[in-house]
Amino acid sequence: MHSVCSIFLSCSHRVIQAKHPPFPLFHSYFHIPDFLSFVFPFVASPPLAFARRKLDHVPKKFARSIGPFLLIVFLFFNLFPTFFFLPFFPDTTKRPNLAD
């Protein structure tokens, strides 16, 4: 599930990035979501599996709330930089009207 979500978010982020390329100042910053969306499933899976085995004494209510929390954090890191800075970038898909 995490890998499907990360692939979808990574692709959607790249589509938006293609229409609104970042300024050089933010260029390295805008690759953070791509990096996180690729690394997240691999990094998060072993610790979560380990925690699930070792923390049997943790109440199930708390254990159920960790998954949605991680998903929210994951979505925040993927979508927030894109949509927060989007209005500040020029839309390079518009071509000048040569008839004027």
UniProtKB/Swiss-Prot annotation:
Keywords: Cytoplasm, Membrane, Nucleus, Transmembrane, Transmembrane helix. It comes from the Eukaryota. It is found in: Cytoplasm; Nucleus membrane. It is a multi-pass membrane protein. One of its GO terms (cellular component) is nucleus. The chain crosses the membrane at residues 30-50, 69-89. This is Putative uncharacterized membrane protein C191.04c.
